[in-house]
Swiss-Prot record:
Record bears the keyword Lipoprotein: yes
Keywords assigned: Cell membrane, Cytoplasm, Disulfide bond, G-protein coupled receptor, Glycoprotein, Lipoprotein, Membrane, Nucleus, Palmitate, Phosphoprotein, Receptor, Transducer, Transmembrane, Transmembrane helix
Gene this protein is translated from: Adra1a
Protein name per the record: Alpha-1A adrenergic receptor
InterPro entries linked to this entry: ADR_fam, ADRA1A_rcpt, GPCR_Rhodpsn, GPCR_Rhodpsn_7TM
SUPFAM superfamilies cross-referenced by the UniProt entry: Family A G protein-coupled receptor-like (SSF81321)
One cellular component term from this protein's GO annotations in UniProt: nucleoplasm
Length: 466
């Protein structure tokens, strides 16, 4: 994946000094390519900072996006500057050894970027198909392993030419040509593009099928909210488990609660955003991976030098446009980008009116507002309150927990109820409520906050039970 093809090097295998550079052409190319490189570097840095500075974006999916941005940042900062100089001067000015290293890093970064998109497509399929099981299927440990596999496979594909898997290099060190050895071209094209592309297309086709099927289910008469958060509802009735010294009234022997399945809207929006990323990736890289194998196996069908350069830089363009796609397609990234650009990163403190958080503690302490024994769980750690609706003066919130076992601990006296309470703070709304319906053992038995799936919480404006 080096800029100059063999077409461009034919007749150039000589040792005399290169021709004089055309100044006007060099300035024009320098401005265009330099602007593209700066835009790509700054844009990918912005993506990384947006995730790093916003804890609600600290999820495995967004870590995959950061990995994609890191690969693109490495490409735009370490490979593209030399590609631009190569294009402007018309010859390679850095020697044979650096040419080989530069070409290997080029393949490494491009392959890591493409495989990163492949991992993201698999992640989105799991998120849309298994939204409730997603936190247990896609864990941070598995995410790290997936990213390590991405970079390991990318390294394997990129280092072949460094160990001699390439055509014989020309004697003139001012020529740094693409590796057109047929075996390596086939291997790299399959591993770097066609296999990941097949996986990406299959995953997104399945995402589309699942999303379409679920949307039909929601429209077929199942109970839904009339708000933006249309959801499937499963109503469950069961008796309370009696507890010694429980402060809960014995009259409430039956608990009526709703377990709402997450609608696919958030997952579908993320899939849509990443679908646009994949679409742009195909448009940018497919021409190159069509031209390169054809030119390697059928030399008589090599495209003109100008066409090859355009196709090659079109592939580079993909690493520069991803930062444009995120804010245009995702409200989360749009707000995160704005915060970073306004230098508001990490300025959200607990006392801020924009803070969102909740505290788990025994019910008796919830009423008094005490802080002893409370467990502060930050937003972005996997536990989130979603505002469902506001009708007739009632605010309804959904509590979703993907808390890993042992991630938070709390000790409760034996005379306390197994009911866990949550204090919600969002702008001017501050209430104390009770989450019911957990089927896990009482907290005092294992000294852990129960792993709560999904609960709906209905409160009046003054916090009264609804």
């Amino acid at each position: 994946m080096v800029l100059l093809s063999e077409n461009a090097s034919e007749g150039s295998n000589c040792t005399h000094p290169p021709a004089q550079v055309n100044i006007s052409k060099a300035i024009l190319l320098g401005v265009i390519l330099g602007g593209l490189i700066i835009f790509g570097v700054l844009g990918n840095i912005l993506v990384i900072l947006s995730v790093a500075c916003h804890r609600h974006l600290h999820s495995v999916t967004h870590y995959y996006i950061v990995n994609l941005a890191v690969a693109d940042l490495l490409l735009t900062s370490t490979v593209l500057p030399f590609s631009a100089i190569f294009e402007i001067l018309g010859y390679w000015a850095f020697g044979r050894v650096f040419c080989n290293i530069w070409a290997a890093v080029d393949v490494l970064c491009c392959t890591a970027s493409i495989m990163g998109l492949c991992i993201i497509s698999i992640d989105r399929y799991i998120g849309v198909s298994y939204p409730l099981r997603y936190p247990t299927i896609v864990t941070q440990r598995r995410g790290v392993r997936a990213l390590l596999c991405v970079w390991a496979l990318s390294l394997v594909i990129s280092i072949g030419p460094l160990f001699g898997w390439r055509q014989q290099a020309p004697e003139d060190e001012t020529i740094c040509q693409i590796n057109e050895e047929p075996g390596y071209v086939l291997f790299s094209a399959l591993g770097s593009f066609y296999v990941p592309l097949t996986i990406i297309l299959v995953m997104y086709c399945r995402v589309y099928v699942v999303a379409k099927r679920e949307s039909r289910g929601l429209k077929s008469g199942l109970k839904t909210d009339k708000s933006d958060s249309e959801q499937v509802t499963l109503r469950i009735h069961r008796k309370n488990v009696p507890a010694e010294g429980s402060g809960v009234s014995s009259a409430k022997n039956k608990t009526h609660f709703s377990v709402r399945l997450l609608k696919f809207s958030r997952e579908k929006k993320a899939a849509k955003t990443l679908g646009i990323v994949v679409g742009c990736f195909v448009l940018c890289w497919l021409p190159f991976f069509l031209v390169m194998p054809i030119g390697s196996f059928f030399p008589n069908f090599k495209p003109p030098e100008t066409v090859f350069k355009i196709v090659f830089w079109l592939g580079y363009l993909n690493s520069c446009i991803n930062p444009i796609i995120y804010p245009c397609s995702s409200q989360e990234f749009k707000k995160a980008f704005q915060n970073v650009l306004r230098i508001q990163c990490l300025r959200r403190r607990q006392s801020s009116k924009h803070a969102l958080g909740y505290t788990l503690h025994p019910p008796s302490q919830a009423v008094e507002g005490q802080h002893r024994g409370m467990v502060r769980i930050p937003v972005g750690s996997g536990e989130t309150f979603y505002k469902i609706s506001k009708t007739d003066g009632v605010r309804e919130w959904k509590f979703f927990s993907s808390m890993p076992q042992g991630s938070a601990r709390i000790t409760m006296p034996k005379d306390q109820s197994a009911c866990t309470t949550a204090r919600v703070r969002s702008k001017s709304f501050l209430q104390v409520c009770c989450c019911v319906g957990s089927s896990t053992p009482r907290p005092e038995e294992n000294h852990q906050v129960p792993t709560i799936k999904i609960h709906t919480i209905s409160l009046g404006e003054n916090g009264e039970e609804v």
